[in-house]
């Protein structure tokens, strides 16, 4: 599979930089067995999906991952948070003291010493964040962030979490292909209506087409199930290899509840994954089940080509369907949720 085979012209006029209003009025192309295609709108989904369909959505929530800081020299610095260093996403966002994040930094070439900082004042009070370089690895910088918040009512320093700081001071991390600065409306527009678990630095894009009314209509005819995959900045990494199979996919953290595992164990239903992040999670679950069965130990990571190499042979030998694999996992999990990296 050569990179050049996937090259085509996409005019900028065809790239949406703001969502359709309402969201479910966006266009939808359907494909059925026999290569039959038809054109619809997302609002038509309830009539298109089978009545026994399980609709799987990714309930990750995009964090305000861009911080615009000032260097000691007065120059501007843009820090793009990628993922926490040596902490889980949940721990880092809940921290009230100090965190170290892996970051991409614009304007860092002349940031040779000192702390970058930013101060913001809103109805809640005064916020201040400082950033210090503590390391670098393969172009990714390790940035130590500290912050304070003074109450508008009392002037006292109050303990706030890192995610609260980001809500007050951060900017939404719009995709680079939009080529426009983030606006306050993006805090709503660049978020799915079912976003719940903070941790992504990019939205699970397919889900942006579903609005509250459509979700209500879908709930009447299908069962909706949530999984969590925190989308990383690697989703925008360009293909530079001649053979696309040599492209190294970035890892992403997922979490699936025990109830979701049980739903996947049900026989005789149709399943529809909303976008590639939901599909990646479901496919990974199957291969992790094969890995668990073969090794006897619960796995928490799936590497890029495991499914094609040793796990593929083992899956052929077992002959497991998705339902069989999830039935086995449901018994082995003992009612526990499953978090992993894929």
Question: What is each stretch, according to the model?
Answer:
Residues 1-342:
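Surface-exposed, charge/polar-rich loops and edge strands
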